[in-house]
A protein has these predicted regions:
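Short, solvent-exposed loop/beta-turn-alpha elements that line the ligand-binding surface or hinge
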Residues: 92, 119-134, 177-181, 204, ...
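C-terminal lobe and pocket-closing loops
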Residues: 292-302, 316-321, 328-435
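Alpha-to-beta junction loops
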Residues: 75, 93-104, 117-119, 201-202, ...
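Glycine-centered hinge/linker elements that transmit conformational signals in sensory
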Residues: 187-194, 234-267, 307, 311
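Hinge/lid segment of periplasmic solute-binding proteins
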Residues: 105-159, 165-168, 186-191, 199, ...
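Extracytoplasmic/periplasmic solute-binding protein
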Residues: 33-34, 144-153, 158, 168, ...
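Conserved N-terminal structural module of periplasmic/extracytoplasmic solute-binding proteins
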Residues: 2-115, 125-130, 174, 336, ...
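Short helix-initiation/N-cap motifs at beta->coil->alpha
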Residues: 80-89, 107, 183-187, 265-280
Length: 471
């Protein structure tokens, strides 16, 4: 999910996606760009997500463009201001109007690859050294039908975020600033009770709207043994979350509200409200990705108040969700354009600690310090831990850390040598699934008499009929 926002989807988008997929099978892969060269014979690389207003982002990318064209005189960059959202992507892809280079999220890889909208980058990944240096857990997130169709941009795994001040008041911190780690979801409830009793604040906060609720719920449900979909022998997809395991996970969420009274009074919590509640000290814990401190400082949360640790276990599995963003290349691109795109990508996402990488990384960390953000979390990297880029970034984080490192040490150790299963997001219609699950969560948090199994039975049927059947 990250910071790249997606507009809420309706059933029509699922139908449009299905139609676009059908069109792609007939012709998307066969035709390459006709105007891939300019008058000077340079390869034209159209770059999407170009900032459309003055500011740091525009200045940075314009400087990168100038350097790139100087270092790669056979390529010319053309600006494209479109940014990814599912409501326009499939129409643009079917119409052949995607920029050569674009960005998206892990959740789109399977569908983009299946539709033939993303170029096969397998050989390019080998040529530029990415294949030997990519984190194995991330590789499967950029692979569709045994083809690598994207280069990872960033990655993160879920952890248990906590408010240091509330943990201290609740007696849940060691003397050196290390939090006590709940081993499972039952202990999370006990910790939340202590926070509510000792501080008067909500022990836990969960998002419930704009797909954020479903996003978090999937990772919880997996640990209860739930499965959300499976591919049949005929290639079709079947929804599979009308099960006792999924119902048990939803019951755990429901009990936070009705049995234990540990959640905020407002049950309609979108992404911004989620971060606002946590960032203003109104809740003690949540499930969040490792980059969450960037979101909560705008609400006044100070670096010394921010903590994160390992994801707790469930009754059936100990698993965490892997999320992230990707670089992709249109399947309409010629071989020269694919090569140019890979060179462009290397200036943005690299496993090598080049001079430019070192400069950009240090400047970024110093800017975070100026902005009052936490420096200390070593997020899950798309690259192997022994790559020079990861090592250099970690050295800088240790050098510039602006809070007690023990507040995040358990998460950093968890990321460095993750002892549990790291699972990518669901492969098909993932954003639609999140919306469906949002509705389930809202139903059980607003209706004390809601039957979790019945709620999921209907949701499973709706998801199958409205989305999976349209693939």
């Amino acid at each position: 999910m990250f910071e790249m926002k997606k507009k809420r989807l309706v059933k029509a988008v699922g139908l449009m996606t299905a139609a676009a997929l059908s069109v792609s099978i007939l012709g998307a892969c066969g035709q390459k760009a006709a105007n891939d060269k300019d008058e000077q014979g340079r390869t034209i690389l159209t770059v999407g997500l170009w900032p459309d207003r003055e500011g740091t982002a525009l200045t940075t990318i314009e400087e990168r463009k100038t350097r790139f064209e100087k270092d790669n005189p056979d390529v010319v960059i053309e600006r494209d201001y479109w940014s990814f959202d599912r409501q326009t992507f499939y129409a643009k892809a079917a119409g052949g109007t995607l920029p050569t280079y674009f960005r998206a999220q892990f959740t789109e890889v399977e569908e983009m690859g299946r539709a033939g909208y993303a170029a096969d980058l397998s050989e390019s990944m080998k040529k530029y050294g990415y294949l030997d240096n990519i984190n194995p857990a991330v590789l499967k997130c950029v692979t569709s039908d045994d083809k690598i169709v994207a280069v990872p941009s960033k990655a993160a795994i879920m952890g248990l975020s906590y408010n240091v001040d509330l943990f201290e008041k609740a007696g849940l911190m060691e003397s050196d600033g290390t939090p006590k780690q709940p081993k499972d979801w039952n202990e999370v409830v006990e910790f939340a009770k202590q926070i509510k009793e000792k501080t008067g604040q909500s022990g836990f906060v969960l998002p419930t709207a704009n797909r954020s609720g479903g996003w978090i719920f999937t990772s919880i449900a997996w640990s209860f043994g739930a499965k959300f979909m499976e591919q049949q022998a005929d290639g079709k997809w079947k929804a599979t979350f009308n099960t006792p395991e999924a119902a048990e996970a939803l019951q755990w969420v429901k009990d936070l509200k009705w049995k234990y009274d540990l959640l905020p009074a407002n049950t309609l919590v979108d992404g911004e409200e989620w971060y606002r509640v946590f960032g203003t000290g109104k809740a003690g814990m949540s499930i969040m990705a490792g980059d969450y401190p960037n979101r909560v400082v705008s609400y006044g949360m100070q670096p010394e108040q921010i903590g994160i640790m390992a994801t707790p276990a469930g009754p059936k599995a100990h698993v965490t969700l892997l999320t992230g963003e990707i670089h992709a290349v249109s399947s309409k691109a010629t071989d020269d354009q694919i090569d140019a795109a890979m060179r462009w990508i290397k200036t943005i996402s690299t496993y090598e600690a080049t001079d430019e990488f070192k400069k950009n990384t240090e400047e970024s960390i110093k800017q975070d310090l100026e902005d009052g953000k936490l420096v200390g979390i070593k997020v899950f990297s798309p690259w192997k831990n022994d790559t020079s880029a990861v090592k250099y970034e970690h050295e800088l984080i240790d050098k510039y850390a602006n809070a007690n490192p023990n507040h995040v040490r358990l998460y950093n150790e968890f990321v460095a040598n993750c002892p549990i299963e790291i699972r990518p997001e669901e492969p098909m219609c993932c954003q639609e699934l999140y919306s469906v699950l949002d509705n389930c969560i809202q139903e059980v948090l607003t209706n004390e008499n809601a039957d979790c199994a019945a709620v999921l039975e209907k949701a499973n049927s709706d998801f199958q009929q409205n989305y999976l059947n349209n693939l």
